[in-house]
Amino acid sequence: MSDKRRTFAVIDGNSLMHRAFHAVPPTMNAPDGRPTNAIFGFLNMFLKMIDAFNPDGVVVAFDKGKPRVRMEMLPQYKAQRPPMDPDLHAQFPMIKELLTALNVPILQSEGWEGDDILGTMARLGEEAGCDMLLVTGDRDMYQLVTEHVNVVSTRKGLSDVAIMTPESVDDLYHGITPALVPDFYGLKGDTSDNIPGVPGIGPKKASALIAQYGSLDEVIAHADEVKGKMGENLRAHIDDALLSRKVATIRTDAPVELDFEATSFPAFSADEVSAALGTLGITAMQNRFLALIGGEGGAAAASSVFEIPAMVRAAAGDADALGAVAAEVSHAIDAGEWVAAVVDDDKEEGALFGLTRTLWLATSKGLFALEEGDGASTAVVDGFNFAHGVIAGVLARLFMEGRVASPDTKALLHELSPIDSSEPELMDPLAVDSTCIFDTVVAAYLLDSDRSEFDEAYLADTYLQMALPAARGAEGACEDAPAPAARTAALTLALVAPLRECMARENAANVFDGIEMPLVPVLAKMERAGMLVDPDRLHSLSEGLATQITEVERSIRDLAGDETFNIGSPMQLSHVLFDVMGLPTKGLKKTKRGYYSTNAKVLSDLARDHEIVRLILDWREKSKIKSTYLDTLGPLRRGDGRVHTTYNQTITATGRLSSSDPNLQNIPTRSELGRTVKTAFSAGEGSVFLAVDYSQIELRLLAHLSGDEHLVRAFNEGEDFHAETAARVFGVPVSEVTPDLRSRAKAVNFGIVYGQQAYGLSQSLHISMAEARDMIDRYYEAYPGVRTFLDNVVARAKQTGYAETMYGRRRHIPELKAKNPQLRGFGERTAMNHPMQGTAADIIKIAMARVSRRLEEEGFAAHMILQVHDELDFECPIDEVERLTTMVRDVMEHVVDLHVPLIAEASTGITWADAK
């Protein structure tokens, strides 16, 4: 493309809206409840396209009505497609209103598809001397590619795109030029559009035939030379091939036009766009759009890019520069200012080590870089002791005397207290005052716990209303672009005040200051403690399980009558179970690839009646245990012979901790295989495992929060709660409650906590919907206070948009406003559950901090080494077991005063498996 020609982007509106709808979770809604996830994704892609290509003009094409033009040629064209999802359909008028506010022309014509409008615009634009960018996810558009028409092909998600030029089309199709793409589809067909093509000819064979003969016409002319079944199909379906090519050919004569000279972008009113975005509740993008224009929005645009402060770098060995930086940091510490700290090891992606380690510090005076030297120094500069290195010296004083802000405070603590306990510890994390640390990602998480990522662009846009400048090494970065870690440090400092303000407004400050920040040093200490694992035991278990897996595989293949299929392939497994063996498919859904699902739910339902399915589930469990734990835990051991999990505070929407690398919380607890894995974890010599677990904490919280007199009395009198529920629900004396009735009552008790409805209960107990509904109704009759409480929780959540815990941890639930009944039902169940599950998460976190403090204050040699949901695990010297058990239970049972007692139960064992 030429640099001198004007560039126009023509967006395939239907393609991008469909892609956005399926890529962005359906939890985004306008204030009035209308779904907006497709609009959000569309606008995100729109802005990325503008940033990447800076077109002089933008237009958007949409389908309008049925595709009359192609249906006249092929009546079954797209006939197999299901109706558009109502939530997606509802968003098309809204995106068109937004595009109108953005002054972006909308092109559509009755009976014509957006593809043909893109084709027409490509021709008209090229004739007008413009370079054209066609933004679409449809590969058949590649036929339009020329020197001055490129296709911006959206691929995975919304951000992965490929720029298709004549050369790249040729490479993709192995010698096929853009003009021959319709010929390619003439042979291959297109199942998504119901275009038949020639049976048995896929993309590789279609490419090979056209490359060999030069065109579809020549392939047909030489059809007698094509051997075998493919030749037979070709000769029998010549008319289908010619028709398919015709249908796949993009028209360039749609009845649309555009004045290219008069069309430009951006050319919109800041007020109109702000109002349109505000109506839909998509305010986070407002400044990204305003940054595109001048005029009234110009002031906003001028200040909308985050400015990186001036930088001062102290290179390794430069004593004068080091002294100057140390003086500035000392001043910030003495003044009680927040100092943002980020360590950068300058390593390439995938590398273990970088060439240079740099500590970036941001203060109110600017941005400072301290490079690590090669050796230790005995120098004490301005109150900093650099005996263990520059980075350690600065961080130690910052943590002990200053106020530290970081996007990952725990990782920063590990600079001084390494995860591998065989490495020397320079500072005990518990010595840090939690009121003097501020983790920006944890703060952002508390404000939006359903969000999966808190990347810097999102944080800057949401809390500073600014765009980030490109960092060094990124596409579009200028020569003096900041290092990524430098930008992170500057942004972190800038975020402290607005995040603190937002937390105060959202009632999240108490959770942040009282629960989450005190927990950070505790988690750092637990991660360093790690868990001792026996590699020989793991190896032995793995070998034994491998033998069992082989035996199960043999049994599966014998029952299937197929020695070759891949049991681990969902597609091949589906074929064997449903096509070959004829297992029932009633009620089963097919995947996008056209085969029946073989997920755990499907197989569990079938397992009751089919031995092969039971064996497949057994094979899956054994294979997962072997690959996920037995074969991977050994290599994860550090120099101290221990594995060190990482605790995550910002992953779960409920507030619970999660663990990773390895995930020790997900080892199955009720499975014999899971117990087997835990036998490889042992306490050190002279020590045992101590496990202390809350008993029925969520049910006890339900009793407290609902105030139901029968529920409260049952717990206060120490009754068998599940038996008591069975007696009340089934109308029998407690003495006559059978194990089956108790089991059913237990399922109802825990199901109610999770907002379970009749369908869920019927599935878990394998009973009819009517019976499940009757059980739930009788439960609410037995405990009327529970029904009132849950109804009030849902009503309040619908009014406020969130549910919250006893401690004020909020979970925003946009699904409550969804028009889709299933999503709305999920939102209601989430609202019911959060007060209990979220409060339980808060309580265990508070207990962890208090237990940790008592361990230090009372001189225990024991270490808290693991947290799994409602359980704390310790490695404890044998002579401390009784004292530690008493202390931990005392702390856990008195975190909070409830209407019912909190009960913590303890057990010990030589291995983790024994401590149950």
Which residues does each PLM region occupy?
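Conserved RNase H-like, two-metal-ion catalytic cores of nucleic-acid enzymes
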Residues: 6-9, 13, 19-59, 75-76, ...
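Function-dense linear segments that define catalytic or interfacial modules
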Residues: 362, 444-470, 484-492, 649-734
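C-terminal polymerase-core module
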Residues: 547-554, 558, 562-611, 781-829, ...
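Conserved "right-hand" nucleotidyltransferase catalytic core of DNA-directed polymerases
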Residues: 237-381, 478, 487-669, 688, ...
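Non-catalytic nucleic-acid-binding/docking modules located in mid-to-C-terminal regions
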Residues: 3-5, 56-59, 104, 127, ...
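Short alpha-helix plus adjacent loop in nuclease-associated cores
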Residues: 76-90, 141, 146-175, 231-233, ...
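Conserved catalytic core of nucleic-acid polymerases
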Residues: 525-528, 637-638, 644-645, 649-652, ...
